């Protein structure tokens, strides 16, 4: 978390990343709001299960419940960043793209067994760094 820049980098954590989300700026109160399905939950307004992290201010899109689907969203986000960097004529890009942004994604062992994770490795044109604990 120390090397990530919330609000600049794009963050796609999975449900076990509570400590990471706290370190990046999700507050304990916001986590509480998510756990009780409160309409003031910044991730999804109480429409998602707890621990489906998301926060607009931190560039952390809301996640789906299906295991591994956020892998595809993360690669799409990374490819959009590559296009924004290559095509300065894209309108409305201010605030959406930073030249040094990265896209962070984490998945668990179960997620690596899903076909979506394999497809991500196969289609990603942006650099992909896989780290195993």
Protein language model regions, located:
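Cofactor-binding active-site loop characterized by glycine-rich and histidine/acidic residues
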Residues: 1-132
